[in-house]
């Protein structure tokens, strides 16, 4: 009986490992991006902390911005904007629910290659209860912190597509330089030989 249980458990592990299954909230970061520089205008801000945490969870080694290595990709965090629109109202016209939208822009600089812009957008709804002002503020802070975490996850999930775009641009560049045949010399048909 114990042998059968061990066999079934081993089989389950092999099946999940063989089909490409991976843990939730982890991304297959390309090997060329396993060492990165995180560049941010606010290195201790909530977005920088969330992105740094996501990079570490995905096995990326972060180097200091002032490092002397220039062969390492750099993730540069840009502007963050949070907008709040009314989603629903009470009968008296007061706002009952807000739709919050966080937009984050960033770019990945691959040395000797190109700069690839990426962005993330996170939507959340927030109920505004006028009877509980303090609880409302605490809930809004928690929602904004969660939005930073989701935006960081989205940015990290876009790293494999940047690597694919970089490979595609390399292929296009080599095909345009080697595949274009030389144009033949012009031959005049009006002049006699």
Swiss-Prot record:
Keywords: Cell outer membrane, Lipoprotein, Membrane, Palmitate, Signal. InterPro entries: LPS_assembly_LptE. Belongs to the LptE lipoprotein family. It is found in: Cell outer membrane. Residues 1-18 form the signal peptide. The gene is lptE. A lipid is attached at residue 19 (S-diacylglycerol cysteine). It comes from Escherichia coli (strain ATCC 8739 / DSM 1576 / NBRC 3972 / NCIMB 8545 / WDCM 00012 / Crooks). GO terms for cellular component: cell outer membrane; transporter complex. It is a lipid-anchor. Residues 174-186 have a biased composition (Low complexity). Component of the lipopolysaccharide transport and assembly complex. Interacts with LptD. Residues 166-193 are annotated as: Disordered. This is LPS-assembly lipoprotein LptE. Together with LptD, is involved in the assembly of lipopolysaccharide (LPS) at the surface of the outer membrane. Required for the proper assembly of LptD. Binds LPS and may serve as the LPS recognition site at the outer membrane. A lipid is attached at residue 19 (N-palmitoyl cysteine).
